[in-house]
């Protein structure tokens, strides 16, 4: 869970505050939705324990980003799905990114930034 709010008379920036205590889950994603899979991955980074995701094949941008940032993620490729395991992340190295295109392409980076300890809010 998270709470969302806006600053100064309902203007941007959007403020997202995560729950203090999340529990890890086992999640079965069978629609091939990279957005659903990524959402659970990001939540798993804040959850106690190990979050396990069994996901139908879909875009792997979030997985590649997690590996690039050396986050505690493991991916096993199966015939019809991927099994992703992710542990709680205490710190995410902050980086500057230039993200072209539409907002949906940058949504994952926005969430990752919000989860980062040194992000400006």
Residue ranges of predicted features:
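Structural preference for solvent-exposed beta-strand-turn elements
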Residues: 1-121
């Amino acid at each position: 869970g998270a709470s969302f709010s806006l600053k100064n008379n309902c203007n941007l920036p959007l403020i997202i505050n995560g729950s203090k205590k999340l529990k890890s889950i086992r999640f079965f994603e069978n629609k091939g939705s990279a957005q659903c899979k990524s959402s659970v991955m990001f939540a798993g980074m804040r959850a106690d324990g190990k979050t396990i995701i069994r996901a139908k094949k879909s875009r792997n941008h979030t997985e590649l980003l997690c590996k690039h940032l050396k986050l505690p993620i493991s991916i096993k490729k199966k015939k019809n799905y991927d099994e992703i395991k992710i542990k709680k992340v205490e710190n995410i190295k902050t980086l500057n990114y230039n993200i072209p295109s539409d907002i949906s392409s940058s949504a994952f980076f926005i969430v990752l930034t919000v989860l980062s300890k040194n992000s400006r809010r």
